[in-house]
Amino acid sequence: MSYEKLKVFIEENFSDKNLVIVSNREPYVHKKIGANIKTENPAGGLSVSMDEVLKAVGGTWVAWGSGSSDRESVDRKNCVRVPPNDPRYTLKRVWLNSNEIDNYYHGYSNQVLWPLCHIALDKVYFKKKYWHDYKKANYVFAKAVLEEADEKSIVWIHDYHLCLVPKMLRNRRPGLVLAHFWHIPWPDYSIFRICPQSKEIIEALLNNDLLGFQLPLFIENFIHCVKESFEDADIDYQTSTITHTPELHTTSTITHT
C-alpha cells in the first residue's frame, strides 16, 4: 500500500478517531538562528509521509525534541501546533537527558538492534546500561502517549527505537488500538536470539493489534521467533495472525508494498 493510498484509507475509515503517531524523530525541529527561531523539516521518508497523513486527518505526533529551541517553542504540555504556517495537528515533544540519548539511541537502538537486524554481528555491542536507559526512554514515550490518547485513539508506533512502548501502553490502557511498523529487516530466530532481551522484545511487540514489516520474509522470520520463544502462542500461518496467552491478545502481521 502506497502512502497516498494509506492516507485515503485513514481518511475514509478513521476520520472519527484520534490518530497518535509515535516515533523517535520529530517532523519539525525548532533551531536558534542568531536572534531568531527557525523551523526545519528533517529529511526522511517517515517524516514526510506521516506529516502528510496527519495534515489530512489531524491528531498528535509524539517524538523526541532534539532541536536547540524546541523547549522554547512548546506550551506547558510540551505541545506545539504544526506546520507553523498552517497548523493542522499537534506535535508533543518528549525530553531525554544526555545519558538516555547516549544509551537508548546511540547505544541500544544503534549498537544492538540495528546491526543485529541487519546481520552485522561484528558491530553488535551490548552494555547493561544501554538496555536500562532504553527501557527508561520507552517509558517516557509511553507516558506522553497516554497523556494525549483517549479511548477512541489509534496509536501508530514506528520502528525499532520503541519496541517496549506497545506493552507499556497495553498494560495501562488495554482498549487502545495499537499498530507498529518495523522499518528495518527482521532476522531469523538463529540471529535474533543472540539479543539477551530477545524474548522481552518479542513479547512487547505482540501487544500490538497490527504489526507491519517491509517484506513477507520478515513476517516469516518474526513468526519463527515467536514460535521458538513462546510455546503457547497460537499461530495462524494462512492469515499471519498470532494469539499469545495468557492474555489471549491477537496480533496480525502485514507487509508494506
Residue ranges and their predicted role:
Residues 1-257:
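Catalytic cores of carbohydrate-active enzymes across secretory and cytosolic contexts
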